[in-house]
Each structure stands twice: as structure tokens, then as C-alpha cells.
Amino acid sequence: MAAQAAGVSRQRAATQGLGSNQNALKYLGQDFKTLRQQCLDSGVLFKDPEFPACPSALGYKDLGPGSPQTQGIIWKRPTELCPSPQFIVGGATRTDICQGGLGDCWLLAAIASLTLNEELLYRVVPRDQDFQENYAGIFHFQFWQYGEWVEVVIDDRLPTKNGQLLFLHSEQGNEFWSALLEKAYAKLNGCYEALAGGSTVEGFEDFTGGISEFYDLKKPPANLYQIIRKALCAGSLLGCSIDVSSAAEAEAITSQKLVKSHAYSVTGVEEVNFQGHPEKLIRLRNPWGEVEWSGAWSDDAPEWNHIDPRRKEELDKKVEDGEFWMSLSDFVRQFSRLEICNLSPDSLSSEEVHKWNLVLFNGHWTRGSTAGGCQNYPATYWTNPQFKIRLDEVDEDQEESIGEPCCTVLLGLMQKNRRWRKRIGQGMLSIGYAVYQVPKELESHTDAHLGRDFFLAYQPSARTSTYVNLREVSGRARLPPGEYLVVPSTFEPFKDGEFCLRVFSEKKAQALEIGDVVAGNPYEPHPSEVDQEDDQFRRLFEKLAGKDSEITANALKILLNEAFSKRTDIKFDGFNINTCREMISLLDSNGTGTLGAVEFKTLWLKIQKYLEIYWETDYNHSGTIDAHEMRTALRKAGFTLNSQVQQTIALRYACSKLGINFDSFVACMIRLETLFKLFSLLDEDKDGMVQLSLAEWLCCVLV
């Protein structure tokens, strides 16, 4: 329940601008300025209670408490490591990024690329901090997280061994911005060890809020050089790596001194005149620093002697910093994949710079409710979250073209908070999405999920080529104008997870989550049915009614259990007393806590209707319905509910094996009827909103 309330609170805060880079969320409620002032007033250096300098901050396995790798580690402040520590020395540069004993080269490559764009850098690394004025042992950084910016506060105690920083450090021994940035990112993800292993674009996106694309260099686009050049000019961040065929090859060094599975950052491209012909060059950087490419165009390679000496002086900087040049043709041969985090994605496909429009959806895959798996599982696939976008305006550069006009969209599906789960053995889920064009007759269909039959009848217009266990999968699609349904999913069903779905479109797109409507029109027996004489029913009622001709919750329990216990077509262990109390609460019109004959007859007819729906929805006649079938049952019962409510129902009423027995089903129906009835009574002006005091709200939810 607390999670649902927190989600509602976040949504309301976002509508008021909270979560922008200028108004970042305070991670764990810590405010940098307030905490720093408290430390300055008290004369005490900050010690972060939320990320203490202790073994748990290091890791949980290889860097866990008691691990040989963590023996001898001492946490020290920069003021204890050198006489005159500096936050940044001479501006932040790529050489400030030197890898330590943590396998987070992917992150370091992203940080190195970040230094190429000062505006981006200082969004992540605020300028208002140093070791001189107002120093209080506290620093702060900002990161993009799933659609919103968060401010992370840390103290400056860093893990050291033998007097040296253990992890990320700068070539300048007295410069600490990069080490502190790594610590803040470790805090955001739970610990340092959680940063081991990843994709460079993950860091790119968390530093910029951009969206990433991947290029397979075994099948490079013909205009690869132009793509890279324009991306760098647009301030985009680029990384590349060499794939390995087995774990044994990881970090292996090739004969020409390239490190396999290592994350390199792309820092520049140039074209030179080489022996009378243009030669395209690309500049890369290895965060390790010590290992550099030894092939053509490397430091001291003979190729440099055959170009204009002035160009050679400009480009050939002989520094052992891990940065080097190579030809574009060698780059394509040697590397496997290129990753680009687009800050202005349209600059890659058009000479003109346009501001793309962004639509952001947040959602959950909840086991038993909205975790339907991929198209290989048609029985549950349709229960995945569904989002609709409408594309009306075609791309500008195609409005006058002869071919079919199209709308370019860039889709990115990102799973949330998976690094936190590494410590409990849960890695990234395999995720993907599919895009379906909505037929004209269904374009106005937004109140409920499209069902199984739709997905059996229609094929996707665009989709991820494969499901992969990366934090984000993304891709471009060129679609004719129209209405489209986007379905994000995990590969296998019943996998819990959170996600955000981003849709960039060149022209503005209308967006709506399918099934976002909440409404209820439950079955009400006709008065003639209630008034109809039934001798058997009357004898049953009189048998358990008291002298006042009223039935209590205990009597109701006995009566109903006796009536339904003989059925063999449903699994029924009996109604519990709380369900019976809910029944009375719904129909007790005079507040006595009991039911009269007419009220009981109404209840009896409702339960018969619930039984009919339950039996119809139990497609495999197992005697129970599963949580995915519950969505259909609710619709049959007259309830239109959004995904959040569906997920809450699955969490509350389904058992561990995702089955819902008849008692739980009836309890859910009764509870929903009660809540809709209460809301309708309180919503006097019928605007879909009610305002209650705390006492009034408690009385309602405790009914």
C-alpha cells in the first residue's frame, strides 16, 4: 500500500516540475545546502548516514564484508590524502578518468565522454563545491533516473589501500571530482560492486537524459563516418567495444593492443590527406590508460610521416593516456558495436536541427497482472501494459517527397532499478517491445486493453529485433501517419519489473495509456428478482436469522459455506469471516451490521452472478481462475480498471501460485462495489474527485 501511495505522490510532484534538472528530486530526502550549512554551523565534517563508510558500501560478494579484496581498505577524506586537495584542476578533462580496481570501465568511458561537453558536465557536477570555501566534507551530483533528475549527496570519505584511492582516480594526484562522482553513482545504485559490468550508454543516459542507439559494426551503415561526426558535433556521447565469444576472453588483449569486452569512448573524428587520398580517422580512449592500439595511425606509426606536418602536430599527441587514433576501416574491422547517446537525435538524420518531442510512460510488469511475456505466450501477452500514440504529421524532409510520407519515431524501453537487485542475485531482465498499427475501427478504443484476439490477428509494424538483457533497448521506426499501439514486455511471462518507455517523435505525437479509464457499473439485481417468492430461500434465511429477522456475519458465513461446499466445479475452502463482514458492509443500508431478508436476497443474487462470471472465466476448468484471467472477469463484472488497480488486485487477492479461489474472487468483487459506492456518494458534483479529512478517510477505508 505504501508503494502505491508513493507512486501517486511522485506523479503529482512531477506535474509541478519536480524532477527537472533545475529542480531535482532530493535522493533519500537529503538536501545539500541544508546539510552543508548544518555542518558549517556545528564545525563538524559531514558523515553520510545513508551511505556510511563501511563494508556494505563496497559490495556484497567480491567486494563484500570479509572478502580478500576488501582487506586493508581504509576510508579517507581527500584532506587526509594530500596537503592541498582540489575538486577540479584546470578544468575537467578526459585524463581525469583513470580506472582502479573496479570493473566499471563502461562508466568511466561515459564520464570521459562527458568531459567533452562542459554544459553537460556541469549539469552532473555542480560548480558550487570545492575543498576551500565552505568546505564541510559534503558534495553533491545530479543524475537522470528514468525520466527525472535526482540530486545525490555524499560525504568525501573514499576507499583507499596503502594510501592510494582504490577505485576511479585522476592522473592529478590532488584532483578528486571524478572519484567523488563515482561514489555518488555507487550510492545511487546501492554500492560500488553494483557498478561492475554494464553498457557505456547506461552511463551516457544517466548523465544526460538522452536516448541511445546501437550500431552493429559487422553490418555498418554506409554513412557511418557522417553519423559519428554529426553525433560528436551535436554533443552526443559515443562508446564502442569488442564482443567476446566466452567469459575467458573478457579483458583479453589482442595482438594490436585492444582490450576485448572493454568500453572505449569515441572522442573525435578527422579526415586527413594521406598519400594523395582522403583518410578518415577516429580517436578513441581506453580509460585504463596503459594499453593503446599499436596498429596503423597509432603513436609513432609510420602513417603520420606521410601527412602535412601541421596536421600531424595537431593530431599526434604522444601521451600515455590511453587515447589513440586509428583509421575508420580498422575501427570497423576491430570493433563489434558502436553506442551513441543522442542529445538531439534528429541531428543524426537531418541537416537541420529540430527539437524532438518526447512522450514518457512509466509502468510495471506485475506477476499475475501485467507481466504477460512476449508474443510466444499468446494466452498472457495481451495483458502487458499497452500505450497508444497517434502520429498525424509527417517528417518535414518528406512532406514533398514522392514516396509514402512517414513519421520517424525513436523508441526506448528501459527497465528500472535492476542494479539494486544484483545483490540478491537478480540481474537484468530480457526485454523488448512491439508496435502495432491500430485499425480504423479500433482507433477510439482506449478504455480497456486490446484482447488476445487482436494480437492473434495483427502483426507488429515495428519491433525490437531480439529480446536482450540490457537496461534499455531502443530503435528507430519510420511509420505512416496513424494510430499505433506500443506493447513493452519481458521475454518470459510472470517476471516482475518496473520500466519507463520513451517515444521521441520529430513532430508532436498524441499519447495515451490504454486502459487508463477507471469506472464501475456492477450487476444490480432487478427489483422483481428480489421480490420474487422463493420458499426454499425463505426457509434457508429463517433457519439462521435471529429473532429480529436479521443475519449476522457469523450466521452468513455458516449459511453460504453450507450452500457452496457441495459444488465440485469450483475450488472452495469456505468464505472467511472478513469476506462475510465485507458483504454485510456493502448491503447494510441501516447500519445495524446485519442483513434483513431483502438485503440477503440481493446478496444471494449477486453471488450467483459472481459464480457465473467465475465459471465462465475459468477457461481450463481448473476450479480457480489465474490472475491474468482476473482482468477478463472484472470486465464481465462491469469494472473498467487501469493497470495500477489491476496490479494492486493481483497483489492482494492472488496466492503465491497466482491462483484466485472463489472466496478471494467474491471478496474482491464486494470490495470493489463498496469502494465505488462510497466514492459515488462522496463525489457530489461528479467531477471524479473527492476531498476528505483524515478522520473521514479512515472511516471510509476501514468500512
UniProtKB/Swiss-Prot annotation:
Cofactors, names only: Ca(2+)
CDD domains attached to this UniProt entry: Calpain_III, CysPc, EFh_PEF_CAPN8
Modifications the protein undergoes after translation, according to the UniProt entry: Undergoes autolytic cleavage between Ala-5 and Ala-6 which gives rise to fragments extending from Ala-6 to the C-terminus, Ala-6 to the EF-hand 2 domain and from Ala-6 to the beginning of domain III.
Location of region: Domain III: 356-379
Keyword ATP-binding among UniProt keywords: no
Tissues and organs where the protein is expressed, per its UniProt entry: Stomach.
Entry function: Calcium-regulated non-lysosomal thiol-protease. Involved in membrane trafficking in the gastric surface mucus cells (pit cells) and may involve the membrane trafficking of mucus cells via interactions with coat protein. Proteolytically cleaves the beta-subunit of coatomer complex.
Protein name (record): Calpain-8
Organism of origin: Homo sapiens (Human)
Lineage, broadest ranks: Eukaryota, Metazoa, Chordata, Craniata, Vertebrata
Gene this chain is encoded by: CAPN8
